[in-house]
Amino acid sequence: MKITFISDTHTNMYDKRYKELMLPEGDILCFSGDLMTSGHNEGELIHFLKWFSKQPFKCKIFIAGNHDRYLENYPLLANDFISKFKNEGVVYLNNSSFEYKGIKFYGTPHQPYFCGWAFNVPDCEKLMHTYQQIPDDTDILLTHCPPFGILDKSHQPNYSNPTGEECLGSKELKKVLDEKTERNCQPKVVAFGHIHGDGGKKEKIGKTLYINASLCDEYYDPTNSIISIDF
């Protein structure tokens, strides 16, 4: 089974690069959030869905990210739009599971507080509780935020990260995944985005393959590598 992972396209309906971007054919396409740019209007969502549904995969799974405000603010309307693409293999996960040909997926968009964007959870205990809902039998976990210390560096200094080398992932997610590893029920793959600087990279730690699937680099150009695996 060939599975391709991407994230953080920040798809702009006026950007020709995305209209021309076609991914290599495979079985399953996983998208780890930030499908929108401003994230406020339905036009961006519809544009993404039209692009996503045309990709050459039988099954196309996506979650939201912090830029995807419309999906958080108008969930009923968003789900109505998404449902129209169900027959084209599009699946949206929001703290929910999905099984395809024996492979169990779970997706969560939630992440630590970041400037009050979408799906932010300021309360650490609530965020921990959210991640604790990840089923133990999950094969492939899709999150928007990386776990702390794993492919989560921006490599670009800014006011909140003076060296550009600080870890920016979620400590809560890392703790939950560590607990699962101790019980030998860790996911086989954890795919995420959010931090563009480590996009297009993968790292095997123990029995788990971690993938930062961000397609955009830190200048929001879609230059990071596309990652595919045989599962």
Question: Positions of the model-derived regions?
Answer:
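Short glycine-/acidic-enriched loop or helix-start segments at secondary-structure transitions
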Residues: 15-16, 40-41, 72-74, 104, ...
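Core catalytic region of metal-dependent phosphoesterases/phosphodiesterases
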Residues: 6, 11-100, 167-169
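Core dinuclear metal-dependent hydrolase active-site scaffold
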Residues: 1-18, 94-135, 216-229
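Short, conserved loop/helix-junction motifs that constitute active-site signature segments
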Residues: 21-24, 52-57, 84-87, 134-136, ...
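Binuclear metal-dependent phosphoesterase catalytic core
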Residues: 97-101, 172-185, 189, 196-231
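Active-site neighborhood of phospho(di)ester-bond hydrolases with catalytic His/Asp-centered motifs
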Residues: 5-7, 29-34, 60-66, 93-94, ...
